[in-house]
Design a protein with these regions (language model features):
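Short loop/turn segments immediately following the C-termini of beta-strands
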Residues: 2-5, 48-50, 61, 93, ...
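Conserved loop/turn motif of beta-propeller repeat scaffolds
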Residues: 40, 94-95
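Structural signal for beta-propeller blades
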Residues: 6-9, 51-56, 106-108
Length: 191
C-alpha cells in the first residue's frame, strides 16, 4: 500500500529475478497497511474515503502469478467519525481478529462474518503500530513526526529504547498464522 499515491499495487515477484515492476494498481485514498487472510483468501486494507473517515476494505486475489490482480473490492466497515487508519495487523491468540490503529484510538475487528464488528480497545491517539503476543502489547507512539526511539505497552510504559533510532513499526518475533502457513514452500521462477 502506498499512502501518498493512494494505491495498492501488485507486483510479479520471482525468487531468482527479484522484484519486477508493478503490474496492477487499485486506487484507494491514503491506502495504509494490508493484511492477508489465508483462511478466507482475502486481502484487507484501510483507506480514507469521502468525508475524511477511515474504512476497512476487503479484496480477493486472483492467484495469477504472472499478472496478479486484486478484485471484488468491498467496503466492509466505515467509521462514523474516525480518521487516519494506520496499522492493521492480526491479533495474536484470537482467531478472526485484526488490530486497527487510527487517529484517536486502537480498535479490534472481528472478521468472522461478512459484516465485521469493531470494538474500541484503547483510547490512545496516533499509535503507528500495534501487536500482541505472549509477552503482552507492543505499540509505537511517535515522539517525532511518525517515529520514536522506543516502543511502549498499552499503559505507555517503555518496553524498549534505542537512542537516536527512528522506529516506525514494532513487532514481536512470533509466527503470524493468520496470514502465513506454518511451513513455507520455496518456489523457484518458472522460466
Amino acid at each position: 500500500a502506498e499512502s501518498k499515491s493512494g494505491e495498492i499495487n501488485t507486483f510479479v515477484v520471482d525468487t531468482v529475478k527479484v522484484l519486477r515492476a508493478k503490474v496492477n494498481t487499485v486506487k484507494l485514498g491514503n491506502a495504509h497497511n494490508v493484511v492477508w487472510d489465508k483462511k478466507r483468501s482475502y486481502l484487507y486494507a484501510t483507506a480514507t474515503i469521502t468525508g475524511g473517515v477511515t474504512a476497512l476494505f476487503r479484496f480477493k486475489y486472483d492467484g495469477n502469478r504472472s499478472n496478479p490482480k486484486l478484485t471484488n473490492q468491498t467496503r466492509i466497515y466505515t467509521f462514523d467519525k474516525e480518521s487516519g487508519g494506520h496499522d492493521l495487523f492480526p491479533v495474536y491468540g484470537e482467531e478472526d481478529k485484526l488490530w486497527l490503529t487510527a487517529a484517536s484510538a486502537v480498535y479490534k475487528f472481528d472478521i468472522s462474518t461478512d459484516v465485521p464488528t469493531c470494538e474500541k480497545v484503547y483510547s490512545i491517539a496516533d499509535i503507528k503500530s500495534i501487536c500482541n503476543g505472549p509477552d503482552g502489547i507492543l505499540m509505537l507512539k511517535p515522539t517525532e513526526e511518525w517515529w520514536a526511539e522506543g516502543l511502549v505497552n498499552e499503559k505507555g510504559e517503555e518496553l524498549f529504547k534505542m537512542d537516536g533510532a527512528k522506529i516506525y513499526k514494532g513487532r514481536w518475533m512470533i509466527d503470524n498464522l493468520f496470514s502465513y502457513p506454518e511451513k513455507h514452500d520455496f518456489v523457484l521462477g518458472e522460466d
